[in-house]
């Protein structure tokens, strides 16, 4: 695959990670900068690009509101600051995007929400629904409960996981550096900027350093970990200096960044991931369902004739035809017990059978490899 440097303005789905040092300074929220960023977000949406924002800053804002001292905080202090700051952060984004007629939603997640299969499917479905409704999700770590994330500052990696979860083709990490260098440019005058990284080698990983800012906790090492996750999921990732006003416009107009290139597209990477999973059960379907799967449609309960194995929601299963031939593999949206109960029934009968509303498809086409 030829290495083609991505163009930010051509993204179909863009995830933008905003570091604390960009959003918050000693005086509080950088309101003018945030308004300019949201101007860029509105312009991107007008071009037809879905946008998801992964924003740090809740703890930094909360500690200012609470008057907590400078320096490291105890875990319970960080959690308290996050609880206060999350409200302020969500309101700030809502107010900055409202003049553009853009609705926002707050999603508080942890890395577990994107790595556990059941929670992954729920997160993906929620995000897809929000984006389909024209909403800009504002994602942050749930720092009020996620003590490990507070200690290690994983918002860079969280952004990469979110990008993979929602099938983004581009991830932009806005930070206080303009990309990856061969050494720390603030201490080594011979350091060279790398505009494109085609493969994350041990030599590239060795270029990671420690955080420079006193506000942001994410250093280059976490950004390289994020890049590895993103490109494995088919998502191109860029590291850009974001302190300027209208940072997305600046990147689109050629500002210096480092792009990390994937070797596949998001959908192909996702299909490969699903195909590699060991199935926990089998679902046998009739001829009509088999034909529908061949046409790229989702698997509905009505076409299911048998369910074997024991599996939970989000687990991988294999789909077989009436003769035992393999048709597809995918992530199932119901447990084996639920699947047996609704097998052969129409989707509009699910609530009456299970006692609660469910999803129309047993396996959605986006979660299936035929």
Swiss-Prot record:
Catalytic activity, EC: 2.7.2.11
Reactions catalysed: L-glutamate + ATP = L-glutamyl 5-phosphate + ADP
UniProt-annotated location(s): Cytoplasm
Protein origin, superkingdom: Bacteria
Keywords attached to this entry: Amino-acid biosynthesis, ATP-binding, Cytoplasm, Kinase, Nucleotide-binding, Proline biosynthesis, Transferase
Biological process per Gene Ontology, one example term: L-proline biosynthetic process
Entry binding sites for substrate: 56, 143, 155
Domain annotation PUA: ranges: 280-357
One Pfam family here: PUA
Gene Ontology cellular-component annotations: cytosol
InterPro entries: AceGlu_kinase-like_sf, Asp/Glu/Uridylate_kinase, G5K_ProB, Glu/AcGlu_kinase, Glu_5kinase, Glu_5kinase/COase_Synthase, Glutamate_5-kinase_CS, PUA
GO molecular function: ATP binding; glutamate 5-kinase activity; RNA binding
Pathway the protein acts in: Amino-acid biosynthesis; L-proline biosynthesis; L-glutamate 5-semialdehyde from L-glutamate: step 1/2
Record-listed ATP binding positions: 17, 175-176
Function: Catalyzes the transfer of a phosphate group to glutamate to form L-glutamate 5-phosphate.
Family recorded in the similarity comment: Belongs to the glutamate 5-kinase family.
Record protein name field: Glutamate 5-kinase
Phylogenetic classification of the source organism: Bacteria, Pseudomonadati, Pseudomonadota, Alphaproteobacteria, Rhodobacterales
Originating gene: proB
């Amino acid at each position: 695959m030829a290495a083609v440097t991505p163009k930010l303005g051509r993204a179909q789905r863009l995830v933008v990670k905003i570091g604390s040092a960009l959003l918050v300074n000693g005086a509080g929220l950088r309101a003018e900068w945030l308004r300019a960023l949201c101007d860029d977000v509105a312009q991107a949406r007008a071009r037809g690009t879905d946008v998801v924002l992964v924003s740090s800053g809740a703890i930094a804002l909360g500690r200012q509101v609470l008057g907590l001292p400078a320096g490291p905080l105890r875990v319970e202090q960080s959690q308290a600051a996050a609880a206060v700051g999350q409200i302020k952060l969500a309101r700030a984004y809502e107010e900055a995007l409202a003049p553009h007629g853009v609705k926002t939603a707050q999603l508080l997640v942890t890395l577990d929400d994107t790595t556990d299969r059941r929670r992954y499917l729920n997160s993906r479905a929620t995000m897809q629904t929000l984006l389909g409704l024209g909403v800009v999700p504002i994602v942050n770590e749930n720092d009020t409960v996620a003590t490990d994330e507070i200690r290690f500052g994983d918002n860079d990696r969280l952004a990469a996981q979110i990008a993979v979860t929602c099938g983004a083709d581009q991830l932009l990490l806005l930070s206080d550096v303009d990309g990856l260098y061969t050494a720390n440019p603030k201490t080594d005058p011979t350091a060279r900027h790398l505009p494109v990284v085609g493969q994350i080698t041990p030599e590239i990983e060795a270029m990671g350093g420690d955080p420079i800012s006193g506000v942001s906790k994410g250093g280059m090492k976490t950004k390289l970990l994020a890049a590895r996750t993103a490109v494995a999921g088919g998502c191109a990732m860029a590291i850009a200096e974001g302190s300027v006003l209208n940072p997305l416009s600046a990147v689109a107009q050629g500002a210096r960044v480092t792009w990390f290139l994937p070797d596949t597209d998001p959908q192909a990477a996702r299909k490969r991931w699903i195909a590699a999973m060991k199935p926990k059960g089998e679902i046998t379907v009739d001829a009509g369902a088999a034909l529908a799967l061949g046409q790229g449609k989702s698997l509905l309960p009505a076409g299911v004739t048998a369910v074997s194995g024991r599996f939970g929601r989000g687990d991988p299963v294999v789909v077989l035809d009436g003769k035992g031939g393999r048709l597809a593999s995918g992530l199932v949206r119901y447990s084996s017990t639920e699947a047996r109960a609704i097998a052969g029934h129409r989707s509009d009968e699910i609530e009456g059978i299970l006692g609660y509303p469910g999803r129309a498809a047993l396996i959605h086409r986006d979660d299936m490899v035929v």
